[in-house]
Amino acid sequence: MSWSRTRVVSAVTAVLLATTTLAACGSDGDKQAESSAGTASSGFPVTLKNTFGDTTITKKPERIVTLGWNAQDVVYALGETPVGMPKVTYGPTADGVTAWDADKFDKSKTTLLDTGDKYPFEKIAALKPDVILAPYEGFDEATYKTLSGIAPTVAYPGAPWQTTWQDQTLLVGEALGKKADAEKLITGISDKIKQVAAEHPEFKDKTITVGSFGAENYVYMPGDPRVQILNEMGFKNAPGVEALEKTNTKKEFSLTISKEKVADVDADVLVAYVDGIGTQKFLADPVYSSLKAVKSGGVYAMQDQQVISGMSAVSVLSVPWVLDKVLPGLSKAASASKG
């Protein structure tokens, strides 16, 4: 594929050089027409809508800062390099990035930003960004305005932390003038997920709940990308999850439930993040072990933080990295379930 892409680029370059030579022989009017066409084809200015308003980017950004999750993945996948991106604190590599970004990250080109407690606005400004990409985030309007004072900021378009991986990809692509390339990335990942669904008929219509269990219990809502991608593979949300979503008036990506209420979201398949207590303690717990999914073997307990992160931060780079790691566990749980 790399060889083919190189050939295409070479061909396009040759055409551009030929066009330039011909243009040099033309009239001034021809040159002006070609200049106008070139400006139009660049795709700028572009205006993108977000939950706080509109963001206009007047020219192709060269210095890119990403915030929140996943935006840097799309930037890398589109052949660009961010000058700044968040430092990873959950399941990081030694360099402080995600496992699927490890082969692309270059610390001499990209500054890692500590965004755990609050945004380091001065450090972000010092990077002199042309654009700030945050399509999968949850900051408030005051933060958005501060960031927008530094550079045009592409924020999330709907509820916090619930932008689909497809929309994240498209927003970043449009912001960088690479919409067509972004659409190709989306098609590639969508085709891969369709292939997974076709190769795993045991997933079809099995009810599923995705949650984090331990000291506190969280259930991820249908609008969360980690749930959406499982739906795309063929699973459907457990009735208890759908019922819980009806109470989700604030449109949060997850809801806390008491341990006594965990049975209300039981399903054919339970994807359980148990990195806080470990798989053995989870399975030995009298409440969790009483669940239908656990009794039948329909539970997929996950405690590796990098793999959990890959399932949670759904992107065009994380999906190819994580699928091979989770499909055996998902398949085993779905095959064992009594749904």
Over which residues does each language-model region extend?
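Proline-aspartate-enriched helix->loop->beta-strand connector
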Residues: 121-124, 128-134, 152, 262, ...
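Short, low-complexity, disordered segments immediately C-terminal to signal peptides
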Residues: 10-17, 25-45
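Structured C-terminal subdomain patch of bacterial secreted/periplasmic proteins
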Residues: 265-339
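A short, structured surface patch at a secondary-structure boundary
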Residues: 71-123
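Bacterial N-terminal signal peptides that target proteins for export
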Residues: 1-12
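Extracytoplasmic low-complexity, Pro/Thr/Ser/Ala/Gly-rich segments
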Residues: 34-80, 89-93, 325-339
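Extracytoplasmic substrate-binding proteins
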Residues: 142-145, 149-215, 312-339
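Basic- and aromatic-lined ligand-binding clefts that recognize polyanionic substrates
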Residues: 63-66, 71-78, 181-241, 245
